[in-house]
Amino acid sequence: IMPKVKEILEHINSLSIQEQRILLISRYAQSLEPKKAIEKSETQLPPLINAELGKVITRFPPEPNGYPHIGHAKAAVIVEEYAKMYSGKLILRFDDTNPLNEKIEFYEAIMEGISWLNIIPDLIKNTSDDIYLLHSYGKKLIDKNGAYICTCDQTTIHDLRSKGLSCQCRKDSENILENSDKIFNGHYHHNEAIIRFKGNMNSNNTAMRDPTLFRIIESSHPKIGEKVILWPTYDFAAPIEDSIDGVTHAFRTKEYELRNELYRQILNILDLRVPEVIEFSRLEFEGLPVSKRKLKPLVEEKKVEGWSDPRLPTLMGLKRRGFTPEAIRRFVLSLGITLSETKPSIEILESFNRKIIDSQSKRLLFVNVPFKITIKNAEPKEVIFKNHPSLEMGYRKINVKNIVFISNLDAEKLNIGREIRLIDLYNIKISWIDKDKKKGIAEYTDDIIKENIEKIEWV
């Protein structure tokens, strides 16, 4: 048996790591199922603090500046699951406060993605719908000495923030109200003035060093046109919208961790209700970029076919690749809600998908990199295959003459004189083989099922 073991080991060691992985998954996928992850996916998410049945309101707030991907799916699934867990409500809110980035096609793509995931919001709205209300809260914050108008250039602002120093605009309280009227009435243009939060320039949390709350963007907005040029940043719009929308539990990715202090302070100054803020980690895959920043160059440089390329983790790409919404949901829930940065393999998502589609899928034979085998002395034969090994999905017939194709990986193990069985067909013995040209000749031997010869898939 040792010569055989040695032969197998030599073949395996000659393969690249990726080829070994493909071979392992293709032949022994069931044995590799992540049992613990599957069990965990069937349990509920951990309970929320200060949550009452029937009163929980969550929100999914994507910016319509790109196509939705698996990271958006994670956030959407989690907030919907919590809304369902507490018999509450889910708001889909487009945080569309940057006219330079927002496009109608992205609103539509996000809606299509949410629909495909079988997520049904109780309310759909745009932050831009409340732009004048946000202006009124901006004025109120200035009146309460919680913000001021800054006319410094960007370089000065950056330098002073890094040094923890205040600019003259913050100190010039006499002109704050006058400048406030000017900025809300359209007196200033792009880069001439911004509204900044009056925080703590000495804070170790740099997010509290007078961040920008409003800036001027002189560009047409896809929803409201050119009516407005003074637009709130996410730092200002998010807490206001969450509070007035009745959101009880606001889920934010870990990247906003330092900005949660600002979130709460803005609401406290304005005497608005403060939602519970829950942080969770973003979703990234091992060896697969997820963020738009990393995917965009691949699309622009035409390294992929577009945003729906099945190699990408966009929802359009995952759909084209054959993933089901339920597999994505189970995968997300298996990860749970945690701050720890993990990069699961996409093979885990694939395993969830296999489990779901197993009972729905016909079994077909497939060979990657075909190797041609011409068979001598074999009578034409009609082979009948079951479309599923255990379920009634019918049959298919294949008429075989004297040519079949096997996988190049299987062909690498063959040599002259070796007998193999073509699954559900018959046995053949190799009489000639050229591995470089990917072709060979074999003799038909018999139809007997033998235990000691390898069984190979063919088409």
Q: How should each PLM-predicted stretch be described?
A:
Residues M2-L9, L349-I357:
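Short amphipathic alpha-helical coiled-coil/interface segments
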Residues Q265, P297, R330-I356:
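Hydrophobic, mid-to-C-terminal alpha-helical segments
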Residues K144-L295, K303, F352-N353, D358-K362, ...:
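Active-site cores that bind ATP or allylic diphosphates and position pyrophosphate for catalysis
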Residues V299-W307, R311-L318:
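Extended, non-catalytic structural segments that build the interaction scaffolds
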Residues E255, V304, G317-K343:
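A conserved active-site cap/scaffold subdomain adjacent to cofactor or substrate pockets
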Residues I1-F236, V274-R282:
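NTP-dependent nucleotidyl-transfer catalytic core
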Residues T58-N65, I91-T97, S243-F251, D309-L315, ...:
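Glycine- and acidic
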